Amino acid sequence: RRVLFRSAWKVAERAVEEGATITLSNTPMAIRMGEVDALAQKLNCQVVPADATSVEDLENVFKTSMDILGGQIDFVLHSIGMSPNVRKKRTYDDLDYGMLDKTLDISAVSFHKMIQSAKKLNAIADYGSIVALSYVAAQRTFYGYNDMADAKALLESIARSFGYIYGREHSVRVNTISQSPTFTTAGSGVKGMDKLFDFSNRMSPLGNATADECADYCIVMFSDLTRKVTMQNLFHDGGFSSVGMSLRAMATYEKGLDEYMDENGNIIYG
């Protein structure tokens, strides 16, 4: 099987374990830092540099990958997310709109550009699979996730809209996987991410899904075993997305439901 990847370490490793031949892609800056090259050497694959917001770059990724792999691509993974507003610690009611544009372009519109580029080039084989990684904040409010929640909501919408078109014309599946919180570069700037990680792990009946388990699920979505699954957002979070309030959380918060205030005595909502 031939697979094209946009930066997802564990999934790349798992795909190669299953016999896939892949290419990797990341920003030129990330490649210069050496980590992607190290993964490529480990997996015996090539890296194609690209700015995910550039249609020209994305078209080059697909063209080059088809040359390297010797034909159309079977599976594609979109695993990209970044918010300048989160990095600059701007709250949702004080966003910089230029930064918001960048958040949406990098984290969601890049998904549309990627699929559109692939479709115009006929780069993905019939009955192929496209997957993007999302998060429950696209559908539920998580204070601190900020404009990344808007980006993930857009990401999921793109999967539905493009999934219909690509499915009708080429039987290509397009889905998003809403993964448990994981410690990533994109999530590192989210306030309280470590506490959210612990909270969701305790709330979920099965606990958080790990990065390795996410990779396993992605492989299933790439496979022919899910040939009729498309236009879906699939929760892979140990059940967290369906839990209202666990008994443990209820007992804990019953002991400490005082209003949360800042150093000036102002109530902090969230």
Feature names for model-found ranges:
Residues 37, 41-44, 48, 54-59, ...:
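Conserved mid-core segment of classical short-chain dehydrogenase/reductases
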